[in-house]
């Protein structure tokens, strides 16, 4: 099992399309003008490209809102990643599925453009 993540800003046109796809799984209180971090687990190691264009199945996915002043750097990303891993280790992802998680939901292809301010993709063996 691998944990993969990507960071993106929703105000860009393409990310709004992504938000439209997943908004049914995101709490209504979240605004599409907020930066978001998308964490997902998949059956095998996969990049953001393969996730979006090969329709890689997602086992679970968390969309976390960030405050606008949030500094998108590796340190803060590492902290968020630890939170997600902690929830995963406690098997809380199914419990949170009705709030801000996608469970077994395949993303359809989405094109990305240069409007994305920050993008980072990683994979970590967690089992």
UniProtKB/Swiss-Prot annotation:
The regions listed as transmembrane in this protein's record are 48-68, 83-103
Keyword check for Membrane: yes
> What is the topology of this protein in the membrane according to its UniProt annotation?
Multi-pass membrane protein
Keyword annotations:
Membrane, Transmembrane, Transmembrane helix
Tell me which domain of life the UniProt entry assigns to the organism this sequence originates from: Eukaryota
Tell me a GO cellular component. Answer: membrane
**Where is the protein localized?**
Membrane
Q: Share any extra remarks.
A: Partially overlaps HOT1.
Q: What is this protein called?
A: Putative uncharacterized membrane protein YMR172C-A
The protein's organism comes out as Saccharomyces cerevisiae (strain ATCC 204508 / S288c)
């Amino acid at each position: 099992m691998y944990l993969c993540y990507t960071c993106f800003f929703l105000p860009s046109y393409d990310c709004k399309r992504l938000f439209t796809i997943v908004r049914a799984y995101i709490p209504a209180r979240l605004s599409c003008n907020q930066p978001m971090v998308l964490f997902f687990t998949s059956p095998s190691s996969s990049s953001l490209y393969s996730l979006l264009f090969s329709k890689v199945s997602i086992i679970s996915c968390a969309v976390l809102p960030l405050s606008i002043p949030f500094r998108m750097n590796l340190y803060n990303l590492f902290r968020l990643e630890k939170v997600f891993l902690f929830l995963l280790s406690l098997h809380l992802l199914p419990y949170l599925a009705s709030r801000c998680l996608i469970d077994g939901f395949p993303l359809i292809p989405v094109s990305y453009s240069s409007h994305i301010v920050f993008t980072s993709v990683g994979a970590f063996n967690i089992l």
